[in-house]
Amino acid sequence: DYKIHYAIKANYDTRLLQIIRKYGVGIDCASGNEVRCAIEAGFDPKSIVYAGVGKRDKEIRYAIEQNILAINCESIEEIDLVNELAAEAGKVVNIALRVNPDIDPKTNHCIDTGQADSKFGISYEEIIENIDTIKSLENINIIGIHIHIGSQIRELHVFENMCNKVNVIVENLTKLGFEIEFVDVGGGLGINYDMPENEPIPNFASVFAIIKQHLKVG
């Protein structure tokens, strides 16, 4: 099964959000304010994922209060912080691990978020190094992983590479005792800026077909 989550940072006009909600689309948030906008627009909290770097304590607290689907954690330190704030609230919070898959998205390095030298996400090796600490945290429940490899991706084989890497990561985490319920995959399909008239809308169908064929989880 799959579900599309709209990146609310693109446009959070209430009228647009009402239309999106009617089609059963979920919401991907990058800030506490975006979580609030989604809640106020009437989205089911369990259709909201909170990703994004630099989350502030008060933003995390709000997401915890709203019982959203998951908070995507960017670092070992953020996992620990979410656990601490969840304990303060007397809750067990669902999280997803943002894993850095070390994949070259064949895009501008400034918008590349998935290679080893990127500041985004947690390397698989770092997860293994901290596995005992992660498992000892009592107020988080790891239910998913989050992969985002970059923006303006024009070479479709990159998405196949991403799926293959995700399959290995999920298999390994499952062997370590984690129950991975979902995989949140991201990476912006590129716009043909050179000849936009030849491709006014990106080839989403091909990307979805690749993910359906190669992603072996769920």
Give, region by region, the residue ranges found by the protein language model:
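Short secondary-structure junctions and interdomain/linker hinges
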Residues: 1-3, 218
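Active-site-proximal beta-alpha core segment in soluble small-molecule metabolic enzymes
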Residues: 3-182, 191
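Alpha-helix-loop-beta-strand connector modules within alpha/beta enzyme cores
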Residues: 92, 166-172, 205-218
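Short glycine/threonine-rich loop-to-helix capping motif typified by GTGT followed
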Residues: 155-161, 192-208
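Conserved glycine-rich SAM-binding loop
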Residues: 188
